[in-house]
Amino acid sequence: EVYKRQSRTVAKAAALLRENAGKVLAANALDLEAMDADSPMRDRLRLTAERIASIAADMESVAGLPSPQGETIAEWTRPNGMTLRKVRVPFGVVGMVCEARPNVTADIFALCVKTGNACVLKGGSDARHSNEAIAALLHEALGAEGIDENTFTLLPAGHEAVGALLSAVGYVDVVIPRGGAGLI
């Protein structure tokens, strides 16, 4: 069943993140090295073994949730006898723009895969190495379950990618900015 495969994919990604924490931490060290030591973004960017374990646990929690797809959230009958229902369905392609928070890469993957959506992520350039390392594991999890790896796409660093994402009308169904007012 599709819903079980989505849950397995998210759980597999969490397991891969735990198993490959060293690789992710090494990539994160490159990002931290390139960032100004006094930057207020530094703590948001920093990953530790504990933070990776927490990210994986959050992904496992999402994997364990029931699928919202197909759930009827409201139903009523009109005076003419016609029954109407509000049913949860995937958006389609979710675009996400975020700052230097590599944990968001895993979060958005888990939420999108679990809900049957594809995701295009534009992460902060400060987290480029971390995001690439995490994305490689997410792609591995997708492949392990026979899901097209393009279900999750990490855009290259740079402001041009944001413009391309925002102008992808007809290809991207919703864009969610996550960050401070300067991002929006």
Role assignments for model-derived ranges:
Residues T48, E99-R101, G124, G158, ...:
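Short beta->alpha junction loops/turns
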Residues K23, N103, H129, E160, ...:
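Short alpha-helical
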Residues S61-G64, P68-E145, V172:
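Conserved small-residue-rich beta-alpha loop and adjacent elements
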Residues V93, I147-I184:
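Conserved NAD(P)+-binding/catalytic subdomain of aldehyde/semialdehyde dehydrogenases
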Residues E1-K86, L111:
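N-terminal Rossmann-like NAD(P)+-binding subdomain of aldehyde/semialdehyde dehydrogenases
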Residues R5-Q6, M59, V94, G116, ...:
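Buried hydrophobic positions in well-ordered alpha/beta secondary-structure cores of metabolic enzymes
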